[in-house]
């Protein structure tokens, strides 16, 4: 007999060899039905794995984040199973979980399009209803290679060859087998709420030199109600797509001559300036001086900083006069060079620097997505050099600044997470222990609740992440605060302590809106293009009922502009109804409509974008009304 301890502290006795599913059944049939896997002594295991010794057990159900992830991963396998049934000559590659769903990449021998997704989905439902048990076997690497070679799965063979482990897991459901670490669901019958959403191209291993594969995306949920809610959200998200709205509002465009880099139009630049000017004022308030550093630096700098060894595949490189250079993927190393131009005392610290720095990252073409995933972007970076004793106070200030910024931009619902050390990192464990604890202490001191994300930190230090929830419930990872003991040391940053000794400062990396491009894309989707007055590229459109009011329209337009209002003058010889509809579609917050009566009385009639009639007032009163809204960030 063995003893199993549960999360509530209770201990129960079971026969050796019992599995988590059996344990769940002994508690209740409904719990067994919902059980996806289990943590056995903090190791995530399949629900049917045998338990042979005393342990601590935590059952994972569809209500747990891990359970939903397992459900989605298993649904990816179901997708591959269905594809192999329908298109037997297809080679399968990889099928990971992504936000809200999964995808699987295939090498089809025939042409596949969006129109084929319903057929594949129908086959998935047929296979799920078979209630096929899901099991796995562990085999030597050589045996796994032979197994997949015999099936003509060359991509699987390549994957196995690249794995250092000598033992491989092969999962099987019905007549389909796939290579996977697991865990997976006990039975396919639990897969009831899923849908295939789209199809795209993707290079094998993200390398454009390799074969183009077909990527099929899907979503999977614990219940049909959850699925329906998500699909409704997707429909709303489609309406809010910043790429579509950006085209309507004439904000920006992309073209193949410069993939992943936006061409900003006048209206887009107006929004950009508001965001940048706001952040500049916020940085001034929090004591940051502004710097500007080079886009290109000798490759030796990136070797010293650690980027060359940890980030080289994402960097653009160039040569000049027999020297190797790299276009910066991050702003931090060049910022350290500004710090290093002077000798610093401990009395000078903290030193806070801010930069709207343009960076370039060689993102795979298949991952590019409008403003949300680009190859060149401007980061609102801040770098603080301080003593270890000052870290917590500085982090508290930065958290406070983040809260203020997000609320002013209309994001009132956000979560904070701490991303802990990744496997691929620089620095020793003692330094990482100290770094992670400092961030926790700073948030604890500020009474801020947070979630821990093991393995998600940057290669040079742990980070605090701010995840913003938008108007339709989507979560966006936005600002970061990163603690770095390594880079200042690698790049020779020092200060003189109170004993006259040289010390290495702690470096805090901070981005609040992050990529300005991405943040503007978020704002467009959050507000569905109806930006608040202070951000709107055009705040007021002035138009006359007939051309008889042209002179008065010009007079009102000039008065608005003199008061700092971003106005547009519409003197076209069109019907007033047409003008109103057009400027409404362009999301202009206020329309000023001028007729004979307004001209004679020197007043204006105002209509909101929503259609609400605000009546008549003087231009001065209207400007005061607008200014009040702008100052309040409404």
From Swiss-Prot:
Coiled coil feature spans: none
Binding site for Zn(2+): 332, 383, 509
Biological processes annotated in GO: threonyl-tRNA aminoacylation
Gene3D superfamilies the record matches: 3.10.20.30, 3.30.54.20, Anticodon-binding domain, Bira Bifunctional Protein, Domain 2, Threonyl-trna Synthetase, Chain A, domain 2
CDD domains to which the protein is assigned, alphabetical: TGS_ThrRS, ThrRS_anticodon, ThrRS_core
Keyword check for Mitochondrion: no
UniProt GO molecular function: ATP binding; metal ion binding; threonine-tRNA ligase activity; tRNA binding
Cofactor binding description: Binds 1 zinc ion per subunit.
Chief location category: cytoplasm
One GO CC term on file: cytoplasm
Localization annotation: Cytoplasm
Region (Catalytic): 241-532
UniProt keyword list: Aminoacyl-tRNA synthetase, ATP-binding, Cytoplasm, Ligase, Metal-binding, Nucleotide-binding, Protein biosynthesis, RNA-binding, tRNA-binding, Zinc
Location of the TGS domain: 1-61
Pfam family, one: TGS
Catalytic activity entry: tRNA(Thr) + L-threonine + ATP = L-threonyl-tRNA(Thr) + AMP + diphosphate + H(+)
Cofactors: Zn(2+)
HAMAP family cross-referenced by the UniProt entry: Thr_tRNA_synth
Self-association state and partner proteins as the record states: Homodimer.
NCBIfam families in UniProt: thrS (TIGR00418)
Primary role: Catalyzes the attachment of threonine to tRNA(Thr) in a two-step reaction: L-threonine is first activated by ATP to form Thr-AMP and then transferred to the acceptor end of tRNA(Thr). Also edits incorrectly charged L-seryl-tRNA(Thr).
Family: Belongs to the class-II aminoacyl-tRNA synthetase family.
Name under which the protein is recorded: Threonine--tRNA ligase
Organism of origin: Francisella tularensis subsp. tularensis (strain WY96-3418)
């Amino acid at each position: 007999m063995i003893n199993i301890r549960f999360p509530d502290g209770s201990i129960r006795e079971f026969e050796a060899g019992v599995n988590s599913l059996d344990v769940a059944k002994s508690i209740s049939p409904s719990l067994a039905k919902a059980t996806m896997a289990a943590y056995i002594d903090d190791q995530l295991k399949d629900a049917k794995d045998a338990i042979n010794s005393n342990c601590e057990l935590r059952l994972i159900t569809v209500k747990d984040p891990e359970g939903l992830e397992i459900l989605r991963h298993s649904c990816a396998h179901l997708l591959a199973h269905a594809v192999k049934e329908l298109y037997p000559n297809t080679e399968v590659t990889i099928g990971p979980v992504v936000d809200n769903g999964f995808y699987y990449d295939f090498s089809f021998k025939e042409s596949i399009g969006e129109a084929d997704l319903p057929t594949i989905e129908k086959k998935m439902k047929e296979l799920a209803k078979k209630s096929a048990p899901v099991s796995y076997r562990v085999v030597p690497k050589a045996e796994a290679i032979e197994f997949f070679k015999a099936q003509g799965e060359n991509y699987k063979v390549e994957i196995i060859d690249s794995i250092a482990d000598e033992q491989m897991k092969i999962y099987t459901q019905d007549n389909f087998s796939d290579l996977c670490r697991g865990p997976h669901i006990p039975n396919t019958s639990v897969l009831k709420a899923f849908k295939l959403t789209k199809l795209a191209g993707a290079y094998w291993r993200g390398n454009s030199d390799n074969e183009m594969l077909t990527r099929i995306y899907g979503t999977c949920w614990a219940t049909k109600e959850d699925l329906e809610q998500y699909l409704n959200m997707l429909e709303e998200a489609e309406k809010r797509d910043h790429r579509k709205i950006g085209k309507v509002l004439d904000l920006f465009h992309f073209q193949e001559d410069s993939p992943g880099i936006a061409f900003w139009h006048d209206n887009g630049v107006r929004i950009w300036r508001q965001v940048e000017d706001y952040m500049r004022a916020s940085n001034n308030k929090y004591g940051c001086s502004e710097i500007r550093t080079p886009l290109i630096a000798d490759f030796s700098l990136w070797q010293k900083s650690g980027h060359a060894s940890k980030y080289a595949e994402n960097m653009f490189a160039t040569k000049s006069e027999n020297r190797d250079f790299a276009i910066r993927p991050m702003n931090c190393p060049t910022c350290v060079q500004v710090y290093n131009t002077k000798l610093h005392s401990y009395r000078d610290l903290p030193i806070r620097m801010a930069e709207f720095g343009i960076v370039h990252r060689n993102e795979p073409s298949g991952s590019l997505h409008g403003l949300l995933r680009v190859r060149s972007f401007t980061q609102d970076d801040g770098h603080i050099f301080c003593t270890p004793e000052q870290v917590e106070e500085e982090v508290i200030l930065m958290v406070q600044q983040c809260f203020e910024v997000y609320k002013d931009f209309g994001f009132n619902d956000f979560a904070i997470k701490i991303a802990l050390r990744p496997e691929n990192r620089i620095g020793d464990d003692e330094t990482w222990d100290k770094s992670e604890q400092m961030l926790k202490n700073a948030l604890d001191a500020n009474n801020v609740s947070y979630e821990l994300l093991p393995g998600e930190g940057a290669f040079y230090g742990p980070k605090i992440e701010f995840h913003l929830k938008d108007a339709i419930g989507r979560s966006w990872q936005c600002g970061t605060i990163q603690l770095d003991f390594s880079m200042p040391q690698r790049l020779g940053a020092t200060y003189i302590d109170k004993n006259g000794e040289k010390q290495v400062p702690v470096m805090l990396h901070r981005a609040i809106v992050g990529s300005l491009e991405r943040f503007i894309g978020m704002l467009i989707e959050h507000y569905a293009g109806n930006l608040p007055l202070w951000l709107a590229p055009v705040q007021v459109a002035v138009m006359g009922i007939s051309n008889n009011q042209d002179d008065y329209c010009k007079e009102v337009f000039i008065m608005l502009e003199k008061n700092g209002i971003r106005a547009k003058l519409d003197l076209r010889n069109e019907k007033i109804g047409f003008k109103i509809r057009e400027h409404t579609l362009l999301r202009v917050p206020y329309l000023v409509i001028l007729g004979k009566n307004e001209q004679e009385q020197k007043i204006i009639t105002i209509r909101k974008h929503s259609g609400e009639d605000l009546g008549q007032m003087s231009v001065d009163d209207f400007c005061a009304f607008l200014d009040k809204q702008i100052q309040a960030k409404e």
